Amino acid sequence: VETWPGRIIFSGFEIGKDILTGKEVAQMSVKNSPIKDAYQMSLSQDNPEGRNSWDQTAVLVAIKGYKPYFKIKLGTIQINDTTGTNQWIDDTAGKHAYLIKEMPEPEIAAIIENYMKHQPLKK
């Protein structure tokens, strides 16, 4: 992380744990959808209200940017190569950042769910 040329935005555990998605995807009528099928299987075995959205929130920020969904805290993460431990240092000029929730979880979940329900157009 020290030598990465651009900004790194960390999306922590707390970001995706309460943003539940997949319920609407699992109920779609589309056939042969690996995403729909995976959610149907996992929701029946886990939480029927949805799955935690750690990956989806990271992808949302990577594609659309962090605003208006989140705020960021600037700083620098230092990683000890020997122990694997890390330390965050607040720094308004830092090239690292971590996400802080800005919008309510259900609103972010609805936005992500809408993207996940998108079907490709036939050409």
Task: Kindly give the residue locations of the regions a language model identified.
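N-terminal acidic, glycine/proline-rich low-complexity segments
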Residues: 1-123
